C-alpha cells in the first residue's frame, strides 16, 4: 500500500473514500459531456432582418471579415458570439448603414442565441483555494492564510470560480494537508504557547558602505534613506529577536521624525532571511508601512505573520535625505518591541466558538518577558581570556553579537609576539560540541584567521594534544562552524591562531565573533491547554453535529454525519485525547464533497441560497443573520436585495473585491513586470506596494457606496497616500495612510484608465506599448470581441528614438490586412494613454535608455535621455481625440457598453460560467438607456439576483 493510500485509508472509512472518488468521476463525466455540443432550436426561420441589414457585407459572395453569415445561418449549430456581441452593442451594422429597429434587433439576437452551440457544464464546482481557506478560517475563528499551499487549478480560465475547474488528486492531497494545519492551529495538541515579549535596540551588522547611512545617538539610531547599488530598498536588520513559532506578532516601533523634513517619513517593516551585503540578497516580504510625522518619539504598531528564521528589518523613506552620511535628520528609532504569538481573545475564538455553551477549563494567560539574548558561552557561565588586545578592540567584542566590532591582538605601540590565542572558560563543564567563528566585517581583512588549532586543559595552563585544527574562509563574512570529532566537557579550551592574514607581514590576529557550540537548551516556552470541562462522547457528538450544520447547512447528509461521528468515536476508543478525536471528526466534514463542492443553485432552497450568497460575496460560509433569514423559506427579490447590500457593507466583502478585481483587471499579475530603474529610477518598493491598493480600495468604494458606473471611466475621487500622491504630482496628501482624495478637475487622473497599477502592468517595464494598453482597455473594460492574432504575424514592440515615430511604426505594422481589423479597435485606446510612462507617471516626452559603462549602479537620475514628444491623439469610431481627457469623453458616450460588459464579467465570476447568449440578452436589458445614473451595487445586485433565481441553467 502506498503512503498516500495508507493515509487515506487511515483517515477515512472506505465508504467515504468511495464517495469522494465517485464524486470526482461524476464531475469528470459532466466535463466530458461538456464537449458534446447541443444543437439549438432547429427549424427556426431566419428573421428577414438578417437579409435586410447584414447580407450586403456577409453573404456568401462577399463574406467581409471572413464572416459568411448566409451559410452559417443555414447550417446550425454555429458559434455566433462575435456576431452577437457586435449586434447587441451596436457595433454592427456600421453606423453609416441602415439600422434595425429595437424589435428587429431583438429578433435577430434571439435567433442567434437559439442557434448558438451550447455546452453542458457541471451544475456544481469545487471551491477555489481562497474560498476554502476563508470558509475554514471563519468556521474555526482563525485568521491564517494558507492559500499558497493549495494549487489554483485556474489555468487559462478568467476566474478561479469557473465550473470547469475539476477536483484532482494533488488538489485533494493538498486540501487534506492544509485542513490538518488549520485544525492543529485551532486545537493545538500541546496547547497554546504563552505570549512572549522581546525588546531590541541593536542592529545586526551591515556592510560598511551602508552603515554610514545610520548614526547611533543617545536616543536611539538615526537613519537616512538609502537604496542598494542594485536599486533595491536596503533594509537594516535588527538583532536580538527571532520568532520561535509561526504565528501573529505585534511589532511596535518607538520612533520620531528628526530634523528638517517636510513630509512624513515612511518606515517599511520587512521580514525575511538576514543578509549582509546587497550582492547576495535574500527574499524579504513587506509587513507594513509606518508613518512618522511627530518630532516626539511615539509608538507605531503593526501586526504581522512571522515564522521561525524570520529577521525583522526596516527601510526608512524620506526623499529629502537620500544617502546622507552620518545623518543629522531622518527617522530616529529608539527601540522595537515584539510580542507573540498572539491569540485574538483568551480563550481563543476557535475554542469559545466551537464549544459555545459548554464550560471550558481556561488557565490564566501567561506572559513571558524574554531576557536580553546571550551567547552560548554567556549562557553556560563561561568567559574569555586573550593573549593580548589592542585598546578599543577588547575581548568582549567577540561576544557582543556584532561582527563589525572585533577583538584584535595588540599592534601598537608595539606588536604582540605570537602565539595569538583565545581561551574559552567552561567552569560548569558543559558538554561542548564545537565552536562558532565569524570573521570581522567591513575592513581590509588584516589579521583574519586563516588556520587554527584547538587544545583542551583541566587547569588553563597545561594543554593537551590538538582536538581540532584546520582552515577558515577569509573571503566571505559568514558564521563558520568548527565541529569536534567527539563532544568534550573540559573547563578550558584554547583557540590558537596558527596563521592569519597580514597586509604588512607583521604577526597579528583578529576575530569578529567566537562562541561555543552546545546542545540546545531546554525550551523556555510554556504551553497552555484549554479543553471543555466535560470531555464525554455526548459533548463530542453535539459539537460535531453543530459544526456540520454551520459548515454544510441545516440539513447535512446523515451518512456524512455518521461517518464523522464514527471516526471521532474510533479516535477516542484508541485512547486519543478529546481534541484529537474532535479534529478527526471535523476533518471528515471539511474534506467531504458536501463541503468542497459548491451547492447547486436552487432559489427554492434556503440553505443553498445562503451558501451561494456567502460564497460569492464573502468567499466563505453564511453568518447567523443570513442563515436565520433563509430558514424561513426562499428569499423574495427584496429580501435578497437587502441581504446583498448588507453583505457588501461587511468587511468580509473585501475578499470578493480583491479576488474579483484581481482576476478581472489582471492585478493578480501585478508583480510580473517591474519598471526599469534605468528609465524610471523613482520607482520603489513603497510605490509598488500601494499602487494596487488604490485600485482595490477604489472598486470597493464604488460597490459599497453604489456610485455610478461611469466612475470606471472617469472619476473625481481616488484613494491615495503621500507616496502615491507624489507619484501623481498631487499636493496636500501627507502620511502613509490610504484615504479618499477628491481630485482636482484639471487632474490627469480619475477612473481605472489612469491608475498607476493599470498603466504599469500593461507595459513591459521599459516602453509604454499602445498595443498592450489598447488591448487591455478593449478586452477588460469595453468588452470588444476580438479574434486571436494571426499566428504568422510577428509581434510588434514599438521603440522610441527611432527615425520613424511611434505611430508610424504601428501604422506600418497594421498595413497587413490580417492585422488591420483588430488594431483599428485596440490601438486608439493605447494612443490615448501615451501621456503615461511605464511606471504610470505623467510625461510629455519619451525616455530612451542612455548607455553606461560597467555594472549597473543605482542613481536617482537614472540612465536615460529625453526623446520625442508624446502624441496622445487618435481617432475612435470615427471621432478624433487629442488627449486622455477627450478620449474619456468619447468612452462615456459608450457607457452602456461598459456597463453591459461589467455585468457579463460579474455574472461569470458569480455563476462560474460565461453567460449564454440568452443570458446576455437578459443582462443587456438590465442596463438603462442612460447608464450614467446606474449604481454599481444596483447592477451587481440585479445580476446576482438573476444568477440566484434563474434555474434554467
Over which residues does each language-model region extend?
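N-terminal secretory signal peptides that target proteins for export/translocation
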Residues: 1-17
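Short coil-to-beta strand junction motifs in C2/discoidin
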Residues: 261-268, 327-331, 444-453, 508-509
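Short beta-strand-plus-loop segments that form exposed binding edges in beta-rich domains
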Residues: 315-327, 496-505
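Aromatic, loop-rich ligand-recognition surfaces of beta-strand-rich domains
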Residues: 372, 388-468, 476-533
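Sequence context surrounding c-type heme c attachment/ligation sites in exported
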Residues: 35-102, 304-308, 725, 740-885, ...
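Extended surface/linker regions that mediate inter-domain or inter-protein docking
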Residues: 111, 135-140, 162-293, 299-317, ...
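Aromatic- and Gly/Pro-enriched helix-to-coil junctions and flexible linker segments
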Residues: 36-201, 309, 317-366, 520-530, ...
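Bacterial N-terminal signal peptides
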Residues: 21-32
